[in-house]
């Protein structure tokens, strides 16, 4: 396998960047009135406009050459075929099987996984039906009104993001809660809002040993039993998303209510699996299935569209262009939709845990930057917070803008106001405002020359800040599924070009091991001297503080 810098297209892109790095998008648009038509794609009713990027036809040609030289198509086909592309863990990567609505056989070690996938989906459908109909009763005979999902990482971020995104589809009478942090405040404050008689807890841990999740799960169980009394009642109020039947049964959960998933499902790609049970309970199983349909639409597009017309490929290549040739360190995801308030946070994990790597698939350290820092907030809030830096700062921050044409929560002219900002921001970031233009706007002001010079520069915008725009009819379950899957495949494309394994997460392990050691040291008040002087000092000061006055 070749590293990014070993491909002929890389050298060509370095030379090309030297020639075009000072080109301004204002001039590119002025020279080509058809730029939007040429540099936009559609999938269903989703419009992807990438015309406001610092690219020429030659740039794109070289980027597509890079994708072909890096083997994006072959590796994509290997993933869909169930090959073990996660080399460090010797696993297949098959979140795509979870939304394989064509039910095509997908083999792992000669075994078709689709019957297992369909079995769990049917189990989820039946369970959701029982809860939503009121047939599932708590220990006192009352129906379930609150669902508390206890998980962390992919077992929390995805379900929470999707449930918030689809809040307008919420099942009447069901309130969803999510607990992830081992900080006791998260669990305590959640339990204060629910009743043991009508609450269902979902424990999401594949191994049923995840430290934070199981600490919270046992606290929830203790709280429940303190009020319910009978341990047999646990089975009416707790279900598990796990594969460890022995531990699940020991906890008191009926293994008939254990929903399985597989080692070829990575945590940050798991909302399509049984991990999505909390989504299905929140918005209805039919809407969960619509998410799967939307993701399948993106999968089929990714599998079949030529690279030049392939949305995730274009997304990934543009990110490579800015990351590896312009030196951009971050990417902002800016949804102009309050329901997507956790979308950027979800892809912080999705992207940064996937591509925050420095070792290639054949064990060499890379000599180039890999995963970008992902961040963002919904518009228009961000405009009054951090857009100042995006517009006038010295950092290049490529941005993705997302918006729905129609809202399910109409209020006066709010949607037009929201979308006017959506359109204006991408135009402003592209065009900017020259010093001369700013000076002309100040012509009617009574200003001294020095003040006029100062304000003309302060009110100028360099522009040439790249953006992608996603515009779609409405944020419904299918559209949400498509958007998520497009970003998943973008991550895949970039990981392939960087020649890294996007599907392990070794970087989270060291801290967990050290935390286990320190936790034992916190069992007493004796000073520690087993670490570096900074860590010793912090631990010892904590011990002093917790003793109180």
From Swiss-Prot:
Annotated Gene Ontology cellular component terms: cytosol
Active-site residues, record numbering mapped to chain: 353, 384, 512
Gene source species: Solidesulfovibrio magneticus (strain ATCC 700980 / DSM 13731 / RS-1) (Desulfovibrio magneticus)
NCBIfam families: PRK00179.1 (NF001211)
BP GO annotations: gluconeogenesis; glucose 6-phosphate metabolic process; glycolytic process
Family, similarity comment: Belongs to the GPI family.
PANTHER family reported in the protein's UniProt record: GLUCOSE-6-PHOSPHATE ISOMERASE
Involved pathway(s): Carbohydrate biosynthesis; gluconeogenesis; Carbohydrate degradation; glycolysis; D-glyceraldehyde 3-phosphate and glycerone phosphate from D-glucose: step 2/4
CDD domains registered for this protein in UniProt: SIS_PGI_1 (cd05015), SIS_PGI_2 (cd05016)
E.C. code: 5.3.1.9
Compartments it resides in: Cytoplasm
Protein name, per record: Glucose-6-phosphate isomerase
Lineage: Bacteria, Pseudomonadati, Thermodesulfobacteriota, Desulfovibrionia, Desulfovibrionales
Single GO MF annotation: glucose-6-phosphate isomerase activity
Keywords: Cytoplasm, Gluconeogenesis, Glycolysis, Isomerase
């Amino acid at each position: 396998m070749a590293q990014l810098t070993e491909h002929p297209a890389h050298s060509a892109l370095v030379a090309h960047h030297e020639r075009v790095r000072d080109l301004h998008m204002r001039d590119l648009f002025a020279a080509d009135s058809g730029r939007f038509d040429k540099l936009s794609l559609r999938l269903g009713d989703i419009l992807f406009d990438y015309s406001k990027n610092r690219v020429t036809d030659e740039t794109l040609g070289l980027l597509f050459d890079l994708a072909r030289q890096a083997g994006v198509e072959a590796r994509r086909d290997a993933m869909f075929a169930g090959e073990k592309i996660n080399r460090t863990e010797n696993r297949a990567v098959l979140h795509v099987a979870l939304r394989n609505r064509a039910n095509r056989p997908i083999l792992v070690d000669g075994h078709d996984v689709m019957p297992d996938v369909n079995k769990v989906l049917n189990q989820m459908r039946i369970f959701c039906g029982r809860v939503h109909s009121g047939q599932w009763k708590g220990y006192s005979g009352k129906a379930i009104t609150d669902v508390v999902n206890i998980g962390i990482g992919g077992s929390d971020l995805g379900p929470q993001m999707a449930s918030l995104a689809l809040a307008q589809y919420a099942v009447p009478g069901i309130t969803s809660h999510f607990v992830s942090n081992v900080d006791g405040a998260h669990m305590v404050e959640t339990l204060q809002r629910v009743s043991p008689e009508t609450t269902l807890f979902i424990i999401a841990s594949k191994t049923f040993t995840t430290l934070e999740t199981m600490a919270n799960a046992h606290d929830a169980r203790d709280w429940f039993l303190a009020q319910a009394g009978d341990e047999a009642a646990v089975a009416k109020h707790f279900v598990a998303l796990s594969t460890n039947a022995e531990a699940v049964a020991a906890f008191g959960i009926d293994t008939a209510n254990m929903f399985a998933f597989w080692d070829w499902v990575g945590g940050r790609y798991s909302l399509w699996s049984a991990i999505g049970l909390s989504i299905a309970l929140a918005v209805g199983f039919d809407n969960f299935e619509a998410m799967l349909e939307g993701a399948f639409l993106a999968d089929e597009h990714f599998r079949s569209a030529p690279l030049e017309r392939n949305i995730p490929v274009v997304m990934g290549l543009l990110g490579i262009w800015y990351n590896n040739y312009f030196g951009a360190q971050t990417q902002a995801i800016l949804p102009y939709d309050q329901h997507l308030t956790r979308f950027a946070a979800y892809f912080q994990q999705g992207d940064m845990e996937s591509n925050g790597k420095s070792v290639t698939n054949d064990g060499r350290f890379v000599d180039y930057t890999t995963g970008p820092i992902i961040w963002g907030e919904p518009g228009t809030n961000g405009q009054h917070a951090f857009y100042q830096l995006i517009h006038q700062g010295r950092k290049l921050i490529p941005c993705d803008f997302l918006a729905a044409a129609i809202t399910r929560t109409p209020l006066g002219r709010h949607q037009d106001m929201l979308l006017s900002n959506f359109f204006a921001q991408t135009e402003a970031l592209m065009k900017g405002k020259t010093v001369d233009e700013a000076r002309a706007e100040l012509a009617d002001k009574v200003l001294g020359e020095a003040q006029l010079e100062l304000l003309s520069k302060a009110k100028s915008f360099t522009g040439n800040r790249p953006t992608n725009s996603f515009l779609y009819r409405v944020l419904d379950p299918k559209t949400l599924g498509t958007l998520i899957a497009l970003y998943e495949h973008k991550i895949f494309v970039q990981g392939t070009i960087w020649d890294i394994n996007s599907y392990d997460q070794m970087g989270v392990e060291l801290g967990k091991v050290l935390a286990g050691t320190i936790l034992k040291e916190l069992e007493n008040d004796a000073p520690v001297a087993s670490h570096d002087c900074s860590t010793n000092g912090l631990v010892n000061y904590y011990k002093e503080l917790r003793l109180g006055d």
